[in-house]
Amino acid sequence: MDPYKNRPSSAFNSPFWTTNSGAPIWNNNSSLTVGSRGPILLEDYHLVEKLANFDRERIPERVVHARGASAKGFFEVTHDISHLTCADFLRAPGVQTPLIVRFSTVIHERGSPETLRDPRGFAVKFYTREGNFDLVGNNFPVFFVRDGLKFPDMVHALKPNPKSHIQENWRILDFFSHHPESLHMFSFLFDDVGIPQDYRHMDGFGVNTYTLINKAGKALYVKFHWKTTSGEKSLLDDEAIRVGGSNHSHATQDLYDSIAAGNYPEWKLYIQTLDPENEDRLDFDPLDVTKTWPEDVLPLQPVGRMVLNKNIDNFFAENEQLAFCPAIIVPGVYYSDDKLLQTRVFSYADTQRHRLGPNYLQLPANAPKCAHHNNHHDGFMNFMHRDEEVNYFPSRYDPVRHAEKVPVPPRILGGKREKCMIEKENNFKQPGERYRSWPSDRQERFVRRWVDALSDPRVTHEIRSIWISYWSQADRSLGQKIASHLNLKPSI
């Protein structure tokens, strides 16, 4: 008997009620009691099983990105970049790869409104012929901090107060007052784009710097960009209040209903590439996740398109159990020394093992569609059917061999072991340029949001002064406007 042909699924349904083990249930309306009013008997195994399963339906929610929605579709290469990467799924125009995408809010809980001012997750899992590739990003091209060592504290500051369970501005502004590199991220979060209209009308970014390697072993730094063909749209503050007040799942519903109606959302994929030999020509570190790469110097190159044309079949199986990790790459794509990426490579898989168990990659949404082979076996909830006798390597009884070697970045590393900051921080230039690119009404809304945040009564004079100093260094007039609204004098 093939156990996979008889696994529980919607395609293999009994016409009558059964227990988990398949025994028929003739009454799913009444418990087994002594007489019509007597006590319930412990031998009512159906009742015990039903309650025990119900008691364990919920799993730990994600620490971040708990609130999300998923959809399935495909990626199609439209432009040849085979000279830049040997990745099989990017080998030629016309090649299609199935995928699943999860959009999410970041900080708030699983049932929170989708209209809160918060970054949005934009995670894509490509099911390629060479294994899965997880491109795990956000709807903003930068991040709050550049070193993953700060990530737990950053999340703690953004999350609700552990005493009151209320998200409070004074905690956020206190923490980030120690991290001026966060200004660029706040220039997105407190901007109009801080609340996307829905998931279909937002762009996505890989955020971190990765590496592309071609067949000759040539390595280039790369940034990934998703551009929605529906146009980027956002909600202003009063619109967000109105939409969230009528439907706290508006973005999830919009995505689901659009796909069900045949209005398939689409994104174009672009890349920016940089030869590592030329990185010193920039006035910032290209591995600094708080920076964007100037498109006039490093132009966007089209790669392909992503179309979401199928809704998920089950929210728990294909959204809650869907797991991403930036460590999951394919030949032709590699990591960089981006300090945030380096820590994400470990942390994402680690949190999935805690949340879903050590065999989470066997779950259908996470498992590769291609053939795979290793000796990782057993452990909690291992449900892969295996019948081999050789579970070690190498062996003369098992013909499995090493795969063909693939190119990796041929970089020579050197230096002392030390904990230090990067040399070219340049924290203020890009947020200032971004602010000056806006029309006056957009600038005024940005100023107002900062004034509201800094008006929290628990924000001290010192913290307000630090933020005014930061924004003054980004743009003198911006700092002056914020200070004027707060009846303070800018320090520079």
UniProtKB/Swiss-Prot annotation:
Binding residues annotated for heme, in chain numbering: 348
Alphabetical list of InterPro entries matching this protein: Catalase (IPR018028), Catalase_AS (IPR024708), Catalase_clade1/3 (IPR024711), Catalase_core (IPR011614), Catalase_haem_BS (IPR002226), Catalase_immune_responsive (IPR010582), Catalase_sf (IPR020835)
Function: Catalyzes the degradation of hydrogen peroxide (H(2)O(2)) generated by peroxisomal oxidases to water and oxygen, thereby protecting cells from the toxic effects of hydrogen peroxide.
Name of the protein described by the UniProt record: Catalase-1/2
Gene: CAT1
Subunit structure of this chain's protein: Homotetramer.
CDD domains in alphabetical order: catalase_clade_1
Cellular component annotations (GO), alphabetically ordered: cytoplasm; cytosol; peroxisomal matrix; peroxisome; plasma membrane
Gene Ontology MF terms: catalase activity; heme binding; metal ion binding
UniProt catalytic activity: 2 H2O2 = O2 + 2 H2O
Transmembrane parts of this sequence: none
EC number, UniProt record: 1.11.1.6
Active-site residues annotated for this sequence: 65, 138
Subcellular location: Cytoplasm, Cytosol; Peroxisome matrix
Upper lineage: Eukaryota, Viridiplantae, Streptophyta, Embryophyta, Tracheophyta
Cofactors named for this entry: heme
Family: Belongs to the catalase family.
Keywords: Cytoplasm, Heme, Hydrogen peroxide, Iron, Metal-binding, Oxidoreductase, Peroxidase, Peroxisome
PANTHER family: CATALASE (PTHR11465), CATALASE-2 (PTHR11465:SF23)
